[in-house]
């Protein structure tokens, strides 16, 4: 209880000097007529994510944000949020967050502007960016301007938990980078392939909401209407705990399994894929009956796969879903052409003058094969922009403190492409910076004011009334238009990814998964998240290696 009390104490209850933003929301130099002490005022904004900005409504008391809830105006989520969104407000008041940059505010602005002048001469040949993925159209516009000004620069994006494998697989077999948006409210039969879509997936808020609609049984007459969930997974998850039929299988064997499902459904598979399917010795009856059930519910059956699985697995899943006429919509998305591997390659060449890292913590969570810490040290200058004084910040030559999303202007898109604003609830508690300002100064554009940049982007996209956009918390009807998957070519996939290895106590498969407490590590200092029990193990304030009792005895 003492720890929880400490969490509440630092969540704004003991903070002083809290100020409202100077733009749009009135400052408290004089008591506004519509503000009554003890009566909350609500504002809309959204929590930025790699691929999904979550629309929220924030409760404020006397200028201080104190509670985050979902925005009911966004119908796919129905006013719901994730536990991460609920706890994100605590990070605003975290006394351990980066409260200032390693140099003065003026010096930071001068240094960012100097990057523009320095690299205009070499076309950006010595300039490398490593950024976390973002849905912001304003950031995308600034990135395009940076690429135009510095054609030789490298723009790479990296997320410790990559959720874009299915989109890359779609591009591989169809030529278009497509995001699948399943409609579980129309699905009667579901096969989940190592995918915890009820908890740890993009848009899991909406997916879970649609799924439970098909699981409600009021009396015996409704039993036939209830959906059926098949779950094949490597560890027990929230999704697996809800399954009607569950099969335990290692992640590395999922490729051979889905190839067997495809063959059982009569899908035309390349010879190499059929060969890979034969590499897995599994209960043939389970595969046969699962495939038959999916086929019997054509138009109302779908398969979803975990994003950690190889592209070849997702390619077969896409092909099967097309054959089943699954209730899935596709929207076209854009992914960065370069990733962390390209950034490391450029750094190892030894001629990078300036490295700009926007968020994340690659020194801590980049794959060990890349040895990011060594590569980062090879840059003439490394600039880290982020909210935490983490391992990457400490290894950088310059640290630029970032504002919390409740302190800043921005924009973004939800998982289905709906445009949403990011607006401040409070003036920055510390002398921190906005990502849009950082990029604008490097790009050398006319204005570096984030509010003006966001408003201009909104106008360019034909948004209409900007104030209504801020009030509603979204632009109605701005979701991405669905597209058809016109062709699927499985001959281009790497069938070797599908071959199932022989596993034993002496040849183990190890999976690193996202923590229910800390995500990819960014919530490690969030007391609320650490207090929240893991849905399966019930662990709090801890982590564990999960192995079976049998393996534990053998080891």
Question: At which residue positions do the language-model features occur?
Answer:
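Non-catalytic, well-ordered alpha-helical segments in soluble enzyme domains
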Residues: 433-459
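Short, surface-exposed connector motifs at secondary-structure boundaries
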Residues: 119-128, 297-302, 351-354, 378
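Active-site phosphate/pyrophosphate-binding segments
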Residues: 245-348, 460-462, 466
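A cross-kingdom feature strongest in bacterial/archaeal respiratory oxidoreductases
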Residues: 43-44, 144, 153, 192-195, ...
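Short acidic (Asp/Glu) and glycine-rich catalytic loops that position anionic groups and cofactors
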Residues: 236-242, 268-269, 296-300, 326-329, ...
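Structural motif
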Residues: 130-134, 194-195, 305-309, 357-361
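A conserved amphipathic helix/loop scaffold
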Residues: 271, 422-435, 440
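N-terminal export/assembly segments and adjacent metallocofactor-ligating motifs
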Residues: 1-282, 288, 533, 540-546, ...
